[in-house]
């Protein structure tokens, strides 16, 4: 999938908490932790779980998660 966002970092899901509507995802990139809040539906569609390899996509207005 091509993206216009240039800030893409590979990492591993360090923690994920899925709520009724939203999911809080913590991704470890090197020695850093990056947090993102995404919809529950997105987390379920991507089958996100702790330890998954993902790509963090950072835009000026949001931080997205893409599963590798």
Residue ranges of model-derived segments:
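Non-catalytic connector elements of ABC transporters
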Residues: 1-68
